Regions:
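Internal, active-site/partner-interface "lid" segment
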Residues: 145-179
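Alpha-helical structural motif
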Residues: 51, 139, 169-173
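Helix N-cap / loop-to-helix initiation motif
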Residues: 78, 179-180
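Glycine-rich phosphate-binding loops that contact phosphosugars or nucleotide phosphates
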Residues: 1-138, 144-151
């Protein structure tokens, strides 16, 4: 379960949506919790990141428990919505991963595993879609790739369970099969 607000949510989605076609990850084992909901992907939903009541309700509705892994992303490390989801998920015994670009981020309190991406100040002050966003994307790529390698979905550096959903990927799958 990827959790975030704004740019962090969008970056989580970038990583998560590729798990099925790249690694044949079961679609029913992938969830996104986005401050402001799905509409927040295309435009800003004001005050969504501050709505901790909604965060609590979503955790309860999704029945997040010990069988879940919840990855919370927050460039500031202090996004109330994301912190609350991770706090409640941890309370429900889910495995929690807190990713913060701020070494003093509150979200780190709720992570069983804490990842600090200390990108410091942005070139354009306050614009977390730059260095912070890039670092989050790289971090998620590393995490998801490591998990898929450990699960046997990569063999000799080749994604052996890729789903060929178009012409380009069908050709790639033939090439992969010839190498395995």
């Amino acid at each position: 379960i990827y959790v975030g607000a704004g740019t962090s949510a969008r970056i989580g989605i970038q990583d998560g949506v590729e798990l099925f076609p790249t690694f044949n990850w079961p679609k029913n084992r992938l969830e996104f919790i986005i401050a402001g909901g799905i509409q927040a992907l295309l435009k800003a939903v004001e005050n969504a990141e501050d709505n901790i009541n909604l965060a609590e309700n979503i955790v309860a509705e999704k029945l997040i428990c010990h069988e879940d892994v919840v990855i919370g992303l927050a460039a500031s490390g202090n996004t109330p919505f994301t912190c609350k989801v991770l706090e409640k998920a941890k309370f429900n015994n889910a495995l929690t991963i807190a990713i913060s670009n701020n070494p003093k981020g509150k979200i780190l309190e709720y992570g069983d595993h804490k990842i600090i991406l200390n990108t410091k100040e942005e070139v354009i002050a306050g614009s977390t879609r730059l260095k912070a966003g890039t670092a989050q994307k790289i971090c998620l790529n590393i995490i998801s790739s490591m998990v898929m390698v450990k699960m046997g979905k990569v063999k000799n550096g080749i994604m052996n369970e890729m789903i060929p959903t178009n012409k380009k990927l069908r050709l790639r799958k033939k090439l992969i099969n010839s190498k395995i």
